[in-house]
Amino acid sequence: MKKGLMISFEGPDGAGKTTVLEAVLPLLREKLSQDILTTREPGGVTISEEIRHIILDVKHTQMDKKTELLLYMAARRQHLVEKVLPALEEGKIVLMDRFIDSSVAYQGSGRGLDKSHIKWLNDYATDSHKPDLTLYFDVPSEVGLERIQKSVQREVNRLDLEQLDMHQRVRQGYLELADSEPNRIVTIDASQQLDEVIAETFSIILDRINQ
């Protein structure tokens, strides 16, 4: 049995990571014999999806930033043990729409919470599991927000309502993460044409699988 592989897709709102994940999935399935599972955070399993609704509900503007962080961690733990780890044990490739880096970028850089606390909580919630590969889709915050506003398919959530400076801090947090872990995190310019982003993503994933 082939070893399972965890690949996370990360990026600020409007970067297009979910669109790219959905586009690259059939290409990978056509190319590879290994089973591929796609999932998302927060969510992926019933308990975590219910937590997702609480976190992203636009009515919950009064939510404390530490409450937000801890809800993400609870959703992460349940999702990991119920869905992700069993798939990896079965030798599957798991494509994850967000994982541990989102908490560092959003609640750390974005909300200003202590990143050392967030990293400890991430380790606690995941038993120190990290992705084998993280694809970070980088886009200027202004471009990301413009895409969100123009999208007719996307449902606006509570985080989309944040001001530009919040999104800029999140992006900076991601860039710092990418600089700190270059062997795990690969940065992709998501301001390119979509077909170029998809092709680059596909190539990077295949290269990592074939190593």
Swiss-Prot record:
Q: Where does ATP bind?
A: G11, P12, D13, G14, A15, G16, K17, T18
Is the keyword Kinase assigned to this protein? yes
Gene Ontology terms describing biological process: dTDP biosynthetic process; dTTP biosynthetic process; dUDP biosynthetic process
Q: Does the keyword Heme apply?
A: no
Q: Which GO terms describe its molecular function?
A: ATP binding; dTMP kinase activity
Q: Which UniProt keywords apply?
A: ATP-binding, Kinase, Nucleotide biosynthesis, Nucleotide-binding, Transferase
- Fetch the Pfam families from UniProt: Thymidylate_kin
Provide a GO CC annotation, any one: cytosol
Catalysed reaction, written as an equation: dTMP + ATP = dTDP + ADP
E.C. designation(s): 2.7.4.9
Family membership, please give it: Belongs to the thymidylate kinase family.
What does the function comment of this entry state? Phosphorylation of dTMP to form dTDP in both de novo and salvage pathways of dTTP synthesis.
Q: Which HAMAP family match?
A: Thymidylate_kinase (MF_00165)
Q: What is this protein called?
A: Thymidylate kinase
Source organism = Streptococcus agalactiae serotype V (strain ATCC BAA-611 / 2603 V/R)
